[in-house]
Amino acid sequence: MGRFIFVSFGLLVVFLSLSGTAADCLSGWSSYEGHCYKPFNELKNWADAENFCTQQQAGGHLVSFQSSEEADFVVKLAFQTFDHSIFWMGLSNVWNQCNWQWSNAAMLRYKAWAEESYCVYFKSTNNKWRSRSCRMMANFVCEF
């Protein structure tokens, strides 16, 4: 009897320790390193895609990558879902932070920028990031 209780307690400890190792993902979402991911085969501009992701789950956003391994995981998911090789990720307005300077070393004082914002998409055929108008349409991957 004592041995049964000891073994049962041991199994309970193992179960509880393993249950916290993966994210609690919704049905249809895939888990990696404590986060949940889902590719959506819907064409949206960047802002609409980000808004859609925030509505899926608390803490949801367009995917962000913290490592090449995470990017590889997401690309495999995307290839199973998309007809196209590009998808939005959560990086945007990267050019607004640049310190522009003229080639003659003069500071930029006069500005006539178009109101175009640039957002970043992931090209899964070569695992590279590219920027394009945030108004363009692309598939996307959400993460929470």
UniProtKB/Swiss-Prot annotation:
Q: Where is the C-type lectin domain?
A: 32-143
Its keywords, alphabetically, are: Blood coagulation cascade inhibiting toxin, Calcium, Disulfide bond, Hemostasis impairing toxin, Metal-binding, Secreted, Signal, Toxin
Q: Which InterPro entries match?
A: C-type_lectin-like, C-type_lectin-like/link_sf, C-type_lectin/snaclec_domain, C-type_lectin_CS, CTDL_fold
Against PROSITE patterns, the record matches this protein to: C_TYPE_LECTIN_1 (PS00615), C_TYPE_LECTIN_2 (PS50041)
Q: Which organism does this sequence originate in?
A: Trimeresurus stejnegeri
Tissues and organs where the protein is expressed, per its UniProt entry = Expressed by the venom gland.
- This chain belongs to which protein, by name? Snaclec coagulation factor IX/factor X-binding protein subunit B1
Where located? Answer: Secreted
Mention any additional remark: Calcium is required for ligand binding.
Question: What does the similarity note say?
Answer: Belongs to the snaclec family.
What function is annotated for this protein? Anticoagulant protein which binds to the gamma-carboxyglutamic acid-domain regions of factors IX (F9) and factor X (F10) in the presence of calcium with a 1 to 1 stoichiometry.
- The residues forming the signal peptide are 1-23
Quaternary structure and partners: Heterodimer of subunits A and B1; disulfide-linked.
- The keyword Secreted belongs to this UniProt entry's keyword annotation: yes
Task: Report the GO molecular function annotations.
Answer: metal ion binding; toxin activity
Q: List the disulfide bonds.
A: C25-C36, C53-C142, C119-C134
Q: Does the keyword Iron apply?
A: no
Q: Which GO terms describe its cellular component?
A: extracellular region
